Amino acid sequence: MIDNRKNVSNKFLCCSFCGKNQNEVKKLIAGMSVYICDECVILCNNIVQEEKKQLEFSLYENMYLPKPCEIFNYLNSYVIGQETAKKILSVSVYNHYKKLKNLKSNNKVELGKSNVLLIGPTGSGKTLLAETLARFLKVPFIISDATTLTEAGYVGEDVENVIQRLLNKCDFDIKKAQHGIIYIDEIDKISRKSDNPSITRDVSGEGVQQALLKLIEGTISAVPKKGGRKHPQQEFFHVDTTNILFICGGAFSGLNKIIEQRVLVKNSIGFNVDINNKLNINNKKNFLSQVQPEDLIKFGLIPEFVGRLPIISVLKELNISELIEILIQPKNALVKQYKLLFNLEGVELEFNENALISIAKESLHKKTGARGLRSIIEHILLDTMYSLPSKKNVQKIVINDGVILRKEKPLFIFN
């Protein structure tokens, strides 16, 4: 019988790379007339990883990384209010890209990801903040709606399609995609549907959280080159999500009550107090600002998912004065946009102060926040924009509060 540790000529097998024989190494892997030992496999892997790091570093080596105050000031140009949220995002994004810029560092301490969770009502500026950040940093950016996502194999959009869309955004440049920003909206809508995680298969709730968890914490995602569902015959792009920054946002309706219950119970322990009186004292208090991970878990997010979103920022509901500022102040303010639109017709458009107040009040009443401002203006200007191109010698159009409150027609001033 031939010793299985020797070849036919009774000689020891040797690694084709380092020359060590099979007795000097733990394992020898055979190929087409060549062999490689376990030590050389590890060495080759280290070389590949080092080259990968060098490539990633070269992307950001010469990149100018704006300081948190510069990011904050840029956000201020487009987003009104939400000072705390802007500051939190500025620092988080700065730290994230500072980490990428210093990938070449030999520091043994591994820096974690600064993924962010934005909590706030509809129209408070969550999506706008994320969009403005990506535009300023000039990195690939997409918005995904969590309500359309399902587990792989079920009807709906696979979670990994989010990465497919990011690749599309940067013309399938994998290196760019691996340093982009993904904003997942309506994240509160994928909360667990039951307190009992095993009661039923929750493919659009806990199942999606589990699938997103892998992407957010960092994994190699296999994305079909032609998009669509995966099948064995497809070719794939392999995207490392480790350095993709994830920002999740949601209104989290009902979370306020969960926090309120925790805070009031905690404050009442050991004291003979009337909970109802306590509630009356605190009824104007914004409990959302006191949110803790335990509250999000009780709301329906799984603990592992909450743990991957270490930075939580709460956005408050916009008031009337802030809504008026949104109408007139930012670089791309709505009033400025409509004035430009009318200027293209050779007509000056004017909103008086009372009109702006009425628009802001209506948006506040409808609870649509800044998002509802455009639809209100579009509605009151619809007939005017329809008839204006057919009118001659129009010099100016004035919008007053009567147009909003009493459905009056705008004032036309002719040459």
Swiss-Prot record:
Keyword match Manganese: no
Residues at which ATP binds: 121-128
Record keywords, A-Z: ATP-binding, Chaperone, Metal-binding, Nucleotide-binding, Zinc
Domain ClpX-type ZB intervals: 3-56
Recorded superkingdom: Bacteria
A single Gene Ontology CC term: HslUV protease complex
Keyword Repeat: no
InterPro entries the UniProt entry points to: AAA+_ATPase, ATP-dep_Clp_protease_ClpX, ATPase_AAA_core, Clp_ATPase_C, Clp_protease_ATP-bd_su_ClpX, ClpX_bact, P-loop_NTPase, Znf_CppX_C4
Binding site for Zn(2+): 15, 18, 37, 40
GO molecular function: ATP binding; ATP hydrolysis activity; ATP-dependent protein folding chaperone; protein dimerization activity; unfolded protein binding; zinc ion binding
Family annotation (Gene3D superfamilies): 1.10.8.60, ClpX chaperone, C4-type zinc finger domain, P-loop containing nucleotide triphosphate hydrolases
SUPFAM superfamilies listed in its UniProt record: Glucocorticoid receptor-like (DNA-binding domain), P-loop containing nucleoside triphosphate hydrolases
A Gene Ontology biological process term: cell division
Function: ATP-dependent specificity component of the Clp protease. It directs the protease to specific substrates. Can perform chaperone functions in the absence of ClpP.
Quaternary structure and partners: Component of the ClpX-ClpP complex. Forms a hexameric ring that, in the presence of ATP, binds to fourteen ClpP subunits assembled into a disk-like structure with a central cavity, resembling the structure of eukaryotic proteasomes.
Family assignment from sequence similarity: Belongs to the ClpX chaperone family.
The name this protein goes by in its record: ATP-dependent Clp protease ATP-binding subunit ClpX
Organism from which the protein derives: Wigglesworthia glossinidia brevipalpis
Gene that encodes it: clpX
